[in-house]
Amino acid sequence: MKKYFGFILLIAILITACIKVPKQFEGLTPGNWRGIFILKDLRQTIITKGKDEVITTDVSTDKKYFTAPFNFSIIQNEKKELVFEVKNADEKIQFYPILFGKDIRTGDDTFYIDLAPYDAHIKGLFDIDQLKGHFIVRDKKNYSIPFEARFGQEFRFEKLPQKATIDINGNWQIVFGKDSNEAFDGIGEFVQNGNQLKGTFRTETGDFRYLEGLVAGDKVKLSCFDGSHVFLFDAMMDGDSLRGIFYSGVHYQVPFVGYRSSNPILQAADTITKIISDKPFEFKFEDSEGNLVSNGDPKYSNKIKIIQITGSWCPNCKDESEFIQSYLQSNPSDELAVFALAFERHKERDKALERIRNYKKHMNINYPVLRAGIANRDSASAIIPQINGIKAYPTMLFLNRKNQIVKVHTGFDGPATSMYESFKKEFANTISELIKSK
C-alpha cells in the first residue's frame, strides 16, 4: 500500500512539473473592462433598537449601488506602455500614464491613472480581474467618486436587457428642471438600434458629448465618462413624453422631460450674448510661462482675432480647442491671431499657471493660453464690458482689425452633435468675411 501511494505521489509530482502556470501580467490586465462610478449606496441601513449598532443588510450585487457605468480597454501603445482607453459611443479617449505601486500598509497592488489634460485621476487597488478605488478631481474641493471595474465584461448597463418596447430614434425637445428657477432647454438627438442606444443632448451652453446606453422595455439609460465628468441619464416613457433624471457625478441632479419633435428649437448660438459697446476689447494677461501677453501688441496689429473664453477643466472647451487647432493647420493665415483666456479653478497663481502649462502641452496648442481669472461666469464677464456677460464656457469672441467685438458664439456644438458640420462652415465663413474687411 505504501509503495502504491509512493508511486501515485511520484506521478502527481511529475505531472505538476510539466504544467506551466501562466505568468500574471505586470500591471492591469490588457483587454476589455466594465467600470462603474457609485453615485448612491442603496444598501439598507437598520439601527438596532436599544444599541449603538448599525447593521448593513447584504443584498445582491446589482442592487447594492446606483451607478453610472462605462466601458474601457487596457491597451498598449507603440512604446509598449499601458493605456486607459475609454469608450463612449463613437468616441475613444486615451489616458496615460498608468502608474503602479504597493500599499506599504497592506502590500496590495496599487494603480494610478492620470486623466490629462484634466486635473484628475483614478487611483486604487487592483487584482488580475478587478479594480477598486476612486475618481478624484484635484481642482474641485473634496470631489471624489467611488470606482470599481471588472475585467472581461463588455456590456454597459445590462448583460441581458429586456426587449425594447419603445423607439426613441430622432430628435426630442427637452426641458431640464421644468418649473424651477434654473430651467434650461435642450435637444435630445438619439440613434437606437434594438436595445442599443447612442446620442447626445444639446443645450444653449454646450452639449453632453458622446452618450451610450440602452433601451430596455420602456426604460432609457445613457452614460458618459470623459475624464472630467461622469454623466448619467435615467429615464422612461410616460405616454408620449420621456421623463427622467440627469445626474452629473454625485453632486448634481435635475429632472428632465422631453417630447418627440421634427423641429426642436434652441436659441441660435450667435444671438445669446449681446454686444453692447463697440469700444475695442484689449487685454494683458500672463501666459503659461508667466510672460505678459496683450492683443494690443504691435505684432498683432491689423489682424482679426479669435478670443476663446475657456478653462482646462471644460470638455466642451477642449472640443473647441481641438477644432480651432485643426482649422489653423488647414487654413494658415498671417491675418488671424488666436488667444485663449483661461479661467481656472485654482485661485493660486502658481497652481493656475501650472495647470495651464500642462494643459497647453498635452493639447499641443500653438497659440497663447493666458491666465485670465477664476472659473466662474462673473469673473469672465467682468473683464469684457463690451458684452452683456459670459453665459457659458466656452464662449468665442470674434474681433475685427480694430479689436472691436463683432460676433459672439456662445457654447459649442461639438463632434457628437448634428450641428458640428454646419458650425464648421459658419466659422469658416465668418473668418473669411473678417479677413476681407479692411
Q: Where are the regions that the model predicts?
A:
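Bacterial signal peptide processing site
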Residues: 19-21
